[in-house]
């Protein structure tokens, strides 16, 4: 496969910002970058993180909560959910049961990691919190819907129709034949009944054969249409493949968490390159469809899947440590667990808001891909579908970044970026705005601790020094000097 220039730039490590490094270069360089530390829970997090500007060290806890609040509002908008919608109206929720309470619970988990020094008693009591219970309830609903979705897809996309009917529908076929014979027998006596039975049997078998022929033909053309997407391999670059595999990897990890007891520290994910590659083919294609062995894409997929296995093991280890450290064994590990490893993998360094927001967006991206897998391949090409996702990410980020700037900064004209407010006035204005917005927090806002947050974001100093500040197109979220 020819290596096309990647459109995505990403953070090469959690200590430095490199916006000029392609998402996938030579394997040796890729391995070297990965050895410097896992930046994200999956390769998709790197894609999401590339759109975000590092936040200044002067960021206060209050301002941080505003930032996260705006993001939760953007997420709710993406999910099609608003407080005015009827919670029972499934159509309004775009097929995903999640609301502000659930997102609030996610944020509380983030707050505890972003600010370990919160006042005693401010932390949630995980096993008693109403928001925790609500989050678990929504998870169960979503998980149930996801299972039904997968089961329905498997039912309609299984190409082994003939074997399935012969193996599992024998009784039904016999019943149809017997019914035809029974109608004939009761309608015309023994002789006429035998003839009618023969006719009924012939009609039944004829209909069955017609159905099988139609289904086989349909599967054949679906397969041919899928193969057309791979006729020109240079149109599918490494970036697209990484995005697809990342979504599948996230989905697979969720299914593993669902069936395992997280109290066992020795637990290992059963993810391996072969199984991930098999999942890729079985979900995004018909089960009978296999990529031609001569295509380099197969080798590329296996290489990426192998690295996904390494990443998954490390993520899983850190998640176990997080659960044990926070005495949260009683909480079932569900979908929101995917966002924890992105900032909990290294307890020695404070996490950045960049990673936090990237993790949230990537989590929803993977979930969206999983729920939409049914007609993904046949409805749109890879390029159109993924470009739509990229555009949505960029648009969402720009929208709420601009809203933050509009609230926190007053300028003398639209082109000026100079704040006319003193720090104290700015803080008062922020507090006033927060009160009007009704932040989704169960408790009162913690006091602003500029000193602690200077330390919290000290790890960003090196990033800030190395960031490209000369470009006027960079969207800044600078909140103070």
From Swiss-Prot:
Positions with biased composition (Polar residues): 24-34
Main location: membrane
Membrane topology type: Multi-pass membrane protein
Keyword tRNA processing carried by entry: no
Cystine residue pairs: none
Keyword Amino-acid biosynthesis (UniProt): no
Subcellular location, record wording: Membrane
Keywords of this entry: Membrane, Transmembrane, Transmembrane helix
GO cellular component: membrane
Regions crossing the membrane: 172-191, 195-214
Annotated segments matching region Disordered: 1-37
Biased composition annotated in UniProt, kind: Basic residues: 1-18
Protein name: Uncharacterized protein CBU_1818
Biological source species: Coxiella burnetii (strain RSA 493 / Nine Mile phase I)
